[in-house]
Amino acid sequence: MSLLQAFSVVLIILAIGDIVSIKTKAFVPSVFVAALLFLFGFWTFFPEDIVALAGFQEPVINLSMYLLITHMGTLLSVDELTAQWRSVLIALVGIGGVIALTMTAGAAIFGFETAVIATPPLTGGVVAAIIMSEAATGLGLEQLAVLAIITYVMQGFVGYPLTSFMLKIEGKRLIKGFRNGEIEFNKPAASEESEIKADKIIPSLPEKFQTTYVLLAKLGLTAWVAVGIGTALEPFIGISPFVYCLIFGVIANAIGFVEKRPLNLSGSFGFMITILMAFIFAGLADATPGMLSELAVPLAGIIVFGVTGMVILSMIIGKLLGYSKEMAFAIALTALYGFPPNYILTEEGAKALAENEEEKEFLMSEMLPEMLVGGFTTVTIASVIIAGIFVNFL
């Protein structure tokens, strides 16, 4: 298979996944559709190295990982997270519940390595899945490498319906209070909706100088420093270099060296994500029907234990912080899918319950900020850190 043939096939599969997800309003996740198509291809006529043949090979994959995670760090606004500290705490405690049950009951039943591999993907997104899959592959644990990917692919099927149900219960409570006059709708002022640009140590470059090369150069330098320091500290602090990339992304943006969302500004984000998604599905080349049948029970068990721990702890902390148990659980559930499903599910719930535009705006203003912060806290930040720590347990 030629380079362009392989590239076209890989992108067609990813595109079909997106189309199905859009048509079903994210009820059927794009990653699930793509995973099924890749499995069918690998079991029939795809060459096992189709992703590598498409040009997505190790050097560019590693580069995209470093740049993407550093980019993710620039998205972190300490001020925004501080304003939503209760949502942040609920999301983190929910993840704590996942870890508590998967690493105790899950590890006891399915084995320590199985729990270690599957837990980080369950607390976040694609980056955590890739970190754990690569670690398992490096140790010759091919079956567990596939488990990391399958966990990432399947967890949304648990998260979507549960979140939708929780948000509808919460929405009914809110809309009843709004219609009775018990809850007021305070529309945010335009100044509150606009992003506050804090003073930076390093002034922002004029827009005309924010070219693709300049933006990527600064992002690359930041990742280089992060990985260099992480490598130097590895004998003393055994944390993945990806964690340092996340931290240095935060610092670089805070001081003004790197702009917020540099990959988006440079027009590179879509291609970087494409590289990572293609790479994660490449791991399914080793997934035989027999292997998947063997993984079905551990997969289901780890997800059940994780979600059970999440619901218990998130509802407890939510009650202590003044949230309803449904809203608290919904915030924690964002760990299973992140953005954009957290936005889509919230909007769908608001549309279903609202009788007019004002009621929809009210419901969105009450639920969406918490859902967005929950997804950002879990998928963008916590999952990378957890995966960076858990790889040392193997």
Show where each model-derived region lies.
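Entry/N-cap segments of selected transmembrane alpha helices
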Residues: E58-S64, M72-T104, L216-G220, G270-L276, ...
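Juxtamembrane and boundary regions of transmembrane helices in multi-pass small-molecule transporters
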Residues: M103-G111, T151-K197, I316-Y323, G375-L394
